[in-house]
Regions:
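Charged, glycine-rich active-site and insertion segments that engage polyanionic ligands
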Residues: 1-47, 51-123
């Protein structure tokens, strides 16, 4: 159910970031922050971490471990080429911090705005 929605949000976000479109990326962050529940926001974070790990695996020339479907192959390969080596590690760490903060009732809007900025800067 949420897979398609989450993939759309993630690809829109990462495409905006690699295109250096900060406004577009921040708009994506607002859309994610507006997901109807904290559980759904956390589920998106888990999904996004998995996507970032797939990008990392492809960067490491381990596509078989990444388990990327045929239709998503081109997208992940393109992102792997666009993202620096440290981007994946930093981003997964930042996403984990967001999940912890969601549990502490911190404003989602602030959290996802901050996450987008950090992703943008760490590219």
């Amino acid at each position: 159910g949420d897979h398609v929605l989450f993939m759309d949000l993630f690809s829109e976000l990462i495409n905006a970031i690699v295109s250096r479109d900060l406004m577009g990326a921040l708009e994506c962050g607002e859309t994610i922050a507006a997901l109807e529940s904290r559980e759904k926001q956390k589920a998106f974070c888990t999904f996004a971490s998995e996507c970032i790990r797939k990008i990392y695996m492809i960067q490491q020339n381990l596509p078989q471990i990444a388990q990327v479907s045929q239709e998503e192959q081109e997208f992940y390969s393109r992102m792997a080429a666009c993202c620096g080596k440290s981007f994946c590690h930093r981003t997964v760490t930042n996403i984990e911090k967001v999940v912890a903060m969601i549990d502490r009732n911190v404003s989602s809007k602030i959290l996802f705005c901050d996450l987008v900025n950090r992703m943008f800067l760490s590219l």
